[in-house]
Amino acid sequence: MTVISTNKDPENLRLTLVAEFDSTPERVWAVWEDPRKLEQWWGPPTWPATFTRHDFVVGGESRYQLTGPNGEVHRGYWRMHAIDKPVRIDFANGLAGADGEPTPELPPVTGYATFEAISSGTRMTAVIQFLDLAQMEMMIGMGMAEGMTQAIGQIDALLTSAPE
């Protein structure tokens, strides 16, 4: 089923995407935990991700780059704030410079993903919390909601193709 709802909430400075998968929470969790699986869905289909670092522990950091269809590169990072396997991940997600390190010009957004067992498999809820309305409008204007929807839309195929 993949993404079943997207909610842009400027009053609370949040973007929420809800997706459902015909798989267990543990298997959906694994597509976040394993960097090689993460590379197969983080980023829209025409902007594949490469994770050069993925320290998936509380306080750990990840570094990644998205490569566009014309070879353009955008870098980003995560900082893990809390991990409750296989229930919830809390993290900061920000832009990085050419060296892969966080850029101070644009503060990171915070976010979390939850994984809930339901009768048909797993409901994953991804929430991005913006610092202010200007940041939210800028990132939504850059296509963040559509990009996340396309990215999450790739998880179904990954779960189907991966062995149990």
Positions of the model-derived regions?
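Short coil/turn motifs at secondary-structure junctions
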Residues: 24, 69-71, 83-85, 96-98, ...
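A short, structured loop/turn motif at beta-sheet edges
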Residues: 25-26, 56-57, 81-88, 114-123
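Hydrophobic pocket/interface hotspot
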Residues: 28, 38, 62-64, 80, ...
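Hydrophobic/aromatic beta-strand elements that line small-molecule binding cavities or substrate pockets
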Residues: 17-19, 51-54, 76-82, 108-117
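Short, highly charged C-terminal tails/helix-capping segments
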Residues: 51, 159-164
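Short beta-edge strand/loop motif at the mouth of beta-sheet-based domains
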Residues: 16, 36-75
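Beta-strand/loop substructures that line and gate deep hydrophobic ligand-binding cavities in soluble
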Residues: 92, 99-146
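Hydrophobic ligand-binding cavity/cleft-lining segments
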Residues: 1-48
